[in-house]
């Protein structure tokens, strides 16, 4: 396995970017030379000087990483669609060769790479010209996966199905993070227990709803990051 992890979610807007920033912050504060990479980012904000990839902005703000956009993302798209549709509408041809080349550049600069996916695992990156799925990129990079999921009602189904699908693809699930976890909520506590039993994934961390990142104990991520 490469020295890095791939962060994916059970769905879009599940908190992958925020969690990516937290993990990167923890690694860098521990003295790790850790960087960030995202193959395709859609939903960027158009400003006078070009497109601003908000995911990169958020990760850098949380983690303290200072890096240029072009060294973090291979393709920055404006429309907030699935990557395959955004690239088609914007007439951008997505190349696996460019993604591989850009990733190698990041890998050569950093000792540990945190890669963030686009949405869930069943995510078409390119479809009209040559079919490219998110799973193809993860396999190419040979990275373990940290799955980010919601903590509330319904997450057992989403999480167990995603873990099962990942394993059917031959991908390794390093751990699971339950986001916006409330320890006083009986549903949240039970969800964690049942997910662990049904998936067999022992490394499960929980992240509460965080108002002030500086007051958050990053050691709460230790379980999911064990061995990294």
Swiss-Prot record:
Cellular component terms (Gene Ontology): cytosol
Pfam families: AAA_26
Any one GO BP annotation for this protein: biotin biosynthetic process
Residues annotated as the enzyme's active site: 38
Cofactor dependency: Mg(2+)
Residues where substrate binds: 42
Binding site for Mg(2+): 17, 55, 116
Subunit structure: Homodimer.
Name of the protein this chain belongs to: ATP-dependent dethiobiotin synthetase BioD
């Amino acid at each position: 396995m490469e020295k890095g992890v791939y962060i994916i979610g059970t769905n879009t807007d599940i908190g992958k970017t925020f969690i990516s920033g937290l993990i990167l912050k923890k690694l860098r504060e521990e003295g790790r030379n850790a960087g960030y990479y995202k193959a395709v980012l859609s939903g960027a904000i158009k400003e006078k000087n070009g497109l601003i990839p908000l995911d990169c902005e958020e990760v850098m703000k949380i983690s303290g990483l200072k890096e240029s956009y072009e060294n973090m993302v291979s393709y920055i798209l404006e429309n907030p669609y699935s990557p395959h549709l955004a690239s088609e509408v914007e007439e951008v041809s997505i190349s696996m060769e460019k993604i591989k080349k850009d990733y190698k550049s990041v890998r050569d600069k950093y000792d540990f790479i945190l890669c963030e996916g686009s949405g869930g695992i069943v995510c078409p990156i390119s479809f009209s010209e040559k079919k490219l799925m998110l799973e193809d990129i993860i396999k190419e990079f040979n990275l373990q996966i940290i799955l980010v999921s919601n903590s509330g009602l319904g997450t057992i189904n989403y999480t167990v199905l995603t873990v099962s699908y990942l394993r059917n693809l031959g991908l390794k699930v390093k751990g699971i993070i339950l986001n916006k976890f409330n320890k006083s909520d009986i549903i949240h506590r039970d969800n964690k227990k049942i997910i662990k039993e049904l998936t067999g994934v022992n490394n499960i961390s929980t992240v509460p709803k965080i108002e002030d990142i500086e007051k958050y104990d990053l050691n709460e991520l230790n379980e999911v990051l064990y061995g990294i």
